[in-house]
Amino acid sequence: MGRSTKKGPFIDNNLLEKVQKMNTSSEKKPIKTWARACTIVPEFIGHTFMVHNGKKFLPVYITERMVGHKLGEFSFTRVFKTHGGMTKESTALK
């Protein structure tokens, strides 16, 4: 179930203030954030966010196609480990 349309999108006020301040000073340094649920708005385009994935901060560069999505969608929290396969250890036991 999504967020109610009458409430509008969730945008972290601190992030929005930092981006607006950087836009006026034309700075482009990465912004560190834990707000994975924050919706990407057009003001974020061209900025890099360091989004926390539960363990470390991953860089996410914002483009036009990302507007409307959440920051957390681009910072994966899980690592896929491959199944099976031939390794030295598995062949040495035979």
From Swiss-Prot:
GO cellular component: cytoplasm; small ribosomal subunit
Family annotation (PROSITE patterns): RIBOSOMAL_S19 (PS00323)
Single Gene Ontology BP annotation: ribosomal small subunit assembly
Family: Belongs to the universal ribosomal protein uS19 family.
Residue stretches in coiled coil: none
Source organism: Elusimicrobium minutum (strain Pei191)
Protein name: Small ribosomal subunit protein uS19
Function: Protein S19 forms a complex with S13 that binds strongly to the 16S ribosomal RNA.
GO terms assigned for molecular function: rRNA binding; structural constituent of ribosome
Keywords: Ribonucleoprotein, Ribosomal protein, RNA-binding, rRNA-binding
Matches recorded under HAMAP family: Ribosomal_uS19 (MF_00531)
NCBIfam families for this protein: rpsS_bact
Domain of life (superkingdom): Bacteria
Any one Pfam family match given in the protein's UniProt record, by short name: Ribosomal_S19
